[in-house]
Amino acid sequence: MSAALPAEPFRVSGGVNKVRFRSDTGFTVMSATLRNEQGEDPDATVIGVMPPLDVGDTFSAEVLMEEHREYGYQYRVVNMVLEAMPADLSEEGVAAYFEARVGGVGKVLAGRIAKTFGAAAFDLLEDDPQKFLQVPGITESTLHKMVSSWSQQGLERRLLAGLQGLGLTINQAQRAVKHFGADALDRLEKDLFTLTEVEGIGFLTADKLWQARGGALDDPRRLTAAAVYALQLAGTQAGHSFLPRSRAEKGVVHYTRVTPGQARLAVETAVELGRLSEDDSPLFAAEAAATGEGRIYLPHVLRAEKKLASLIRTLLATPPADGAGNDDWAVPKKARKGLSEEQASVLDQLAGHRLVVLTGGPGTGKSTTTKAVADLAESLGLEVGLCAPTGKAARRLGEVTGRTASTVHRLLGYGPQGFRHNHLEPAPYDLLIVDEVSMMGDALMLSLLAAVPPGARVLLVGDTDQLPPVDAGLPLLALAQAAPTIKLTQVYRQAAKNPIIQAAHGLLHGEAPAWGDKRLNLTEIEPDGGARRVALMVRELGGPGAVQVLTPMRKGPLGMDHLNYHLQALFNPGEGGVRIAEGEARPGDTVVQTKNDYNNEIFNGTLGMVLKAEGARLTVDFDGNVVELTGAELFNLQLGYALTVHRAQGSEWGTVLGVLHEAHMPMLSRNLVYTALTRARDRFFSAGSASAWQIAAARQREARNTALLERIRAH
């Protein structure tokens, strides 16, 4: 092979020498012999997502050449197709291949097969398997295992090769096989856009493959998929549960560049096929008649919204009681001790209601009230469950109440098959206290309330002025208007002296912070060179362990990725490292988990410190939970010196450095800066521009399209 490092992927063929590591997701590290017209590398390190491989397997692949600081040159697989024959067709090679890859064949039998048939054994197994009965030791039962094993491998090879022939990468092809099974190729040949049903593959990817194959731009399959994509994106990017029909049609036009008439037909077709749903509820008939358009949902979102409204109505309409129909909730005088009148009213509301909402801004005593509720419930002999959407928020809830709290997912017993606790097997609590409810979308709220036992109570705690949830829906806002709700308004003396809390309450009235306090200040920076300036400010404030950087966006000169690059360069410089989702991680780096990992008990948003980096493995300390991560697990990590404000929701730090500039204009809103500011306990410093804060303070968020409140009130 050439000693130079080509910038673009190139083609090679090769054979497997040794598989060193393989994860459940297909991420593999192996030693292989690679060759192309430029030469041969007899002991190449090859990494990436690959089909199941064993010693002796042959393949063709598209690879990128990289240089690792510790391990030297390695080849990263972009795409790979497994061949049907081993590289070594000698007697020893055939024997090794049969032993490793063909079911029912051990070392002795493999040697006999190789000696009897040599390289012809593969064709015979495919075309005339009965001849194997000539080999001593092969019975009808053994032959059946051999043929079944070979057929299964052949099917998988043909599937993967066929899918890659459609233009899919090996990673996409394996995902498709996992999702559709043996029907994967047939399904995608009939409609390539069914690829969008596969987790992690969206319309834009499928459309790129479609256009590369010369597919018609006005094909109904393409337009229907675009209509579904418009609704999916409305949920994931804007949190909408539905779109007015005209907005859905505009989405189709935007993503496909077809005419409005074709887009209208696409939405109609998607509804007829059941891939979208139009809400035909009498509740919205007058609106539809007046506007001439209905509300378009993804079917599962519409079902969830209706079911959630039904559950909430049941909780509001039924009295609290134990399994025998009794209720002994009483509020003695001592339970009110130290509480204001509005705080104590929460205890009284829980006497007669199963579902109560507690809201309020910083410094108003939500934590004190929550602890008082838990104390009273336990004094009455009730089982109390405490949870929050994220691990950090759960830890904070546990600290303020003096009890064990968990994530919502853990409390509900989340596993591969979903939640263990549901309406059939409710969670074993008489009272559920849920904090940071502003982070919960409709889907998670539905799972939570479905697991509430008959007669049990729920206290939902949150701040309606914070950022809305990442997921679709806005359940806290609806519940705060439909359920018994106590909004704490009194800011307590000690909190009132905190300039951060003063500024937070000012933001709610559209006022930008009054900078200039030693605990609340702003440094003007520009996007050009701004990330470097932020890194220097972090150093002045004591380094990454003493301050958390927050920013509205991931991308851009003042986005999370660029800030992390400069922060890592200043505080943990070096070359190489282990590849993660963005960049590389080295010992000493701060990282953040971006997905729940129940096997390792690491939850979305948890910060960790890299202790060790070896090969393609990282050892990370997540608040005392030391885990070794490898393969696809590494791509659930990002550098965590800087976080987005959304990622920081539910967390709190002593000192926060918030980056805010007009460069973040699409994201600037009152809820965003209020959430960023209230992540700081003691000191908040901003890098950016005062005018950006003024713009954000004056700008309310776009209303979300959700009908939850209307459905709750409809009965």
From Swiss-Prot:
Description of the deletion phenotype: No significant change in resistance to gamma radiation, slightly increased sensitivity to UV radiation but remarkably decreased resistance to H(2)O(2), 50% reduced catalase B activity. Normal growth in the absence of DNA damage, increased sensitivity to gamma irradiation, UV light and H(2)O(2), greater efficiency of transformation by exogenous homologous DNA. No change in sensitivity to mitomycin C (MMC) or methyl methanesulfonate (MMS).
Record has Secreted as a keyword: no
One GO-annotated biological process of the protein: DNA recombination
Segments of this protein annotated with the region Not required for helicase activity: 1-150
Reactions accelerated catalytically: Couples ATP hydrolysis with the unwinding of duplex DNA at the replication fork by translocating in the 5'-3' direction. This creates two antiparallel DNA single strands (ssDNA). The leading ssDNA polymer is the template for DNA polymerase III holoenzyme which synthesizes a continuous strand; ATP + H2O = ADP + phosphate + H(+)
Record feature DNA-binding region, as residue ranges: 391, 407-414, 470, 554-555, 596-604, 644-647
GO molecular function: 5'-3' DNA helicase activity; ATP binding; ATP hydrolysis activity; ATP-dependent activity, acting on DNA; DNA binding; single-stranded DNA helicase activity
Any Pfam family the entry gives: SH3_13
Enzyme class: isomerase
SUPFAM superfamilies: P-loop containing nucleoside triphosphate hydrolases
Disulfide feature: none
EC number: 5.6.2.3
UniProt xrefs under InterPro entries: AAA+_ATPase, Coronavir_polyprotein_1ab, P-loop_NTPase, RecD2, RecD2-like_HHH, RecD2_N_OB, RecD2_SH13, UvrD-like_helicase_C
GO CC annotation: exodeoxyribonuclease V complex
pH-activity relationship: Optimum pH is 6.3 to 6.5 for unwinding of a 56 bp substrate and DNA hairpin binding.
Stated consequence of mutating N604A: 10-fold reduction in helicase
Entry keyword annotation includes S-adenosyl-L-methionine: no
Binding site for ATP: Q343, G363, T364, G365, K366, S367, Q466, R493, R679
Keywords, in A-Z order: ATP-binding, DNA-binding, Helicase, Hydrolase, Isomerase, Nucleotide-binding
Subunit: Monomer; homodimers seem to be inactive.
Role: DNA-dependent ATPase (ssDNA stimulates the ATPase better than dsDNA) and ATP-dependent 5'-3' DNA helicase. Plays a role in an antioxidant pathway. Involved in DNA damage repair and/or recombination. Appears to move along DNA in single base steps, powered by hydrolysis of 1 molecule of ATP. Has low processivity, unwinds about 15-20 base pairs/second. Short (20 bp) substrates with 5'-overhangs or forked ends are the best substrates, is much less efficient on 52 or 76 bp substrates with 5'-overhangs. The presence of single-stranded DNA-binding protein (SSB) increases unwinding 4-5 fold.
Other comment: There are no RecB or RecC proteins in this organism.
Family the UniProt entry places it in: Belongs to the RecD family. RecD2 subfamily.
Protein name as catalogued: ATP-dependent RecD2 DNA helicase
